[in-house]
Amino acid sequence: MTQNTEKLPELIDVHSHILPGMDDGPKTVGEALAMLEAAYRQGVRRIWSTSHFYPQKEDPASFLKRRAEAAGRLKDGWRASLMPKIYLGAEVAYFFGLGRCKPVCDLTIGGSPFLLVEMPPERWSDDVVDDLLMVRYVLGLRPIIAHEERCLPEQP
């Protein structure tokens, strides 16, 4: 029996490690394509691809190049009618100075103002909170906290 996916609500996966070989997601193009097809069958029509960006390991330019190459590898097997639309972004590991780092503007979700930020799990100092606010008010981005369940219980 086939499932009629047209009657499912349109779902958006807002945090996915779907690009092959980028981080802890699929290792191969085949695995990534199978995951995309499965997501589509479950009603997912849009995926925010949020590969890890660790500023202590690489600069934004090299990350963007790696991400573009990984996304390019998916194109050969891509079947748009059976797969969700992918919006490229990043899961940016917080670093002090984030609120003044203009290159992170290139790591937003699909060119939107939304920046997925992985915050430290320990209690945040006032300086860290101020820095996160600068992401909003200096860079003009809207930070979204990734894995809030890991860090918000530690906050006052």
Show which residues each predicted segment covers:
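An N-terminally biased module of ancient metal coordination in phosphate/nucleic-acid-related enzymes
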Residues: 1-82
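Extended substrate/RNA-proximal surfaces in nucleic-acid metabolism proteins
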Residues: 58-156
